[in-house]
Amino acid sequence: MKALSKLKPEEGIWMVDAPKPEMGHNDLLIKIRKTAICGTDVHIYNWDEWSQNTIPVPMVVGHEYVGEVVDIGQEVRGFSIGDRVSGEGHITCGHCRNCRAGRTHLCRNTSGVGVNRDGAFAEYLVIPAFNAFKIPDDISDDLASIFDPFGNAVHTALSFDLVGEDVLITGAGPIGIMAAAVCRHVGARHVVITDVNEYRLELAQKMGATRAVNVAKEDLKDVMSELGMTEGFDVGLEMSGVPSAFHSMLDTMNHGGKVAMLGIPGGDMAIDWSKVIFKGLIIKGIYGREMFETWYKMASLIQSGLDISPIITHHYKVDEFQQGFDAMRSGQSGKVILNWD
């Protein structure tokens, strides 16, 4: 079968002819229709330090997808041939304390599709049926293919009550932009997003941000004054992994504010803990999606009128994958879709 593989320990992704994956008794075989390129895939392409320490080579990559069930393991119940599915990319162990308590998103033995095991950038993918999520008929293939990153946005944004709150989002990548749309949809008052990438700030404004702030040109505190904010942000969503952005967030949070952190700093990050202590801030780390509460919320948000389609800015045939990766690496894109049909 046709697949995109991290074939060599150097920059790049390669098209290969890979064997069709074999199923187990509890698995589904999925024929891939569309995949989306994640920031993680860009890290793997670039072969940065994280990738060198994490990714086995060679390996089929990719974990954002939608496809059709074409074969079902003999122990699987609840799925039929032809079902349209996406899937949770974190394969959990099922036997650790958190898994047994129903907190599978906190499994300490997680394996990642397209990170630790063969991924979805292929004509066929095998995953445990437990990880598959049926896509409602009224949700398009395009939107279903980005449910994985949309889930990161939903999990982060809905960590705290947002109704009537002022929200600061640091980092206008696709996940941060989708989080801004979620915040507005569920009733936040002001949603301010910061970055230095004008293309993505414009996209964030289109998707519902009250203000998209280029912090290289504007002072965040001036924007707060312009919006009539006198006390600070109630909720912070840190999506960038940039220390200066997190420091700015701590400076502008209201007392008793709540911060959800999805962005991963590149190394150790020093912060002024006195601000956390004296402001009484709550900081919560976010990893992946809650299984499967986040997935049900994703579908329901779209079905209730949330439009995240503007975040999809580029489509390519899979044979044009290099153009897709070039678009993602340029920073002048939202989500990039590869068509496998």
UniProtKB/Swiss-Prot annotation:
The active site is at residues 40, 43. NAD(+) binds at residues 175, 195, 200, 262-264, 286-287. Zn(2+) 2 binds at residues 93, 96, 99, 107. PROSITE patterns: ADH_ZINC. SMART domains: PKS_ER (SM00829). It is found in: Cytoplasm. It is an enzyme of class 1 (oxidoreductase). Belongs to the zinc-containing alcohol dehydrogenase family. Its EC number is 1.1.1.103. GO terms for cellular component: cytoplasm. PANTHER family: L-THREONINE 3-DEHYDROGENASE (PTHR43401:SF2). This is L-threonine 3-dehydrogenase. Homotetramer. HAMAP family: Thr_dehydrog. Keywords: Cytoplasm, Metal-binding, NAD, Oxidoreductase, Zinc. The record marks 148 as: Important for catalytic activity for the proton relay mechanism but does not participate directly in the coordination of zinc atom. Binds 2 Zn(2+) ions per subunit.
